[in-house]
């Protein structure tokens, strides 16, 4: 069975079994809703167990979650650094122009026929996602996921066509 990252447990929160999670999903409200089941993977990416979400709330840049039947810091402290993943069968169908992070990360970015680099990360600073493109011999390029910049996303061919607008690339 395939699993996809939705978050990483970065710390505990208080004494009642809550954990701070750094989310890597656009669907945090759905993934971390009460009753949702996620797979817990250790730092070596080995499956540990399936967990059920007992509660979820947002706090600053973190999602604060609690697992069912784990209500004390001593029970959950060992999970710091572990990843939360969703099973492939639990992924929802997306609308046209929407993609899961695992589909985007690793795609090659082209401007015309020139290879710009490879998408290595997706940031969520505000209204639009920002794709971090790793380039050879240059600093990473930050590309906003907006229509004037991202012209075409071709998942089967692992290719993204872009137009780098003036001001986006400070090395040119």
Curated annotation (Swiss-Prot):
The UniProt record lists the keyword Chaperone: yes
Keywords per UniProt: Chaperone, Cytoplasm, Ribosome biogenesis, rRNA processing
PRC barrel domain boundaries: 96-168
Pfam family, one: RimM
Gene3D superfamilies, per the entry: PRC-barrel domain, RimM
Record-given protein name: Ribosome maturation factor RimM
Compartment(s): Cytoplasm
Recorded GO MF terms: ribosome binding
UniProt note: domains: The PRC barrel domain binds ribosomal protein uS19.
SUPFAM superfamilies referenced in this protein's UniProt entry, alphabetically: PRC-barrel domain, Translation proteins
Any Gene Ontology CC annotation: cytoplasm
Binding partners and assembly: Binds ribosomal protein uS19.
UniProt entry tagged with the keyword Secreted: no
Encoding gene, per UniProt annotation: rimM
Lineage, highest ranks first: Bacteria, Bacillati, Bacillota, Bacilli, Lactobacillales
Family from the record: Belongs to the RimM family.
First-listed, main subcellular location of the protein, grouped into a coarse class: cytoplasm
Biological processes annotated in GO: ribosomal small subunit biogenesis; rRNA processing
Source taxon at top rank: Bacteria
Function noted in UniProt: An accessory protein needed during the final step in the assembly of 30S ribosomal subunit, possibly for assembly of the head region. Essential for efficient processing of 16S rRNA. May be needed both before and after RbfA during the maturation of 16S rRNA. It has affinity for free ribosomal 30S subunits but not for 70S ribosomes.
InterPro entries referenced in this protein's UniProt entry, alphabetically: PRC-brl_dom, PRC_barrel-like_sf, RimM, RimM_N, RimM_N_sf, Transl_B-barrel_sf
């Amino acid at each position: 069975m395939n699993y996809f990252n939705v978050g990483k447990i970065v710390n505990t929160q208080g004494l009642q079994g809550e954990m701070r999670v750094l989310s890597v999903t656009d669907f945090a409200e759905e993934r971390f809703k009460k009753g949702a089941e996620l797979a817990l993977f250790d730092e070596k990416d080995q499956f540990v167990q399936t967990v059920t979400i007992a509660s979820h709330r947002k706090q600053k840049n973190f999602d604060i979650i609690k697992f069912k039947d784990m209500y004390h810091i001593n029970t959950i402290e060992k999970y710091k650094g572990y990843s939360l993943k969703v099973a492939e069968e639990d992924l929802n169908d997306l609308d046209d122009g929407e993609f899961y992070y695992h589909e985007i990360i690793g795609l090659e970015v082209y401007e015309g026929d020139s290879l710009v680099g490879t998408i290595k990360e997706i940031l969520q600073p505000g209204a639009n996602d920002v794709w971090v493109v790793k380039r050879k011999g240059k600093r990473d390029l930050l590309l906003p996921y907006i229509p004037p910049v991202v012209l075409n996303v071709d998942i089967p061919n692992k290719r993204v066509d872009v137009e780098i607008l003036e001001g986006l690339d400070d090395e040119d």
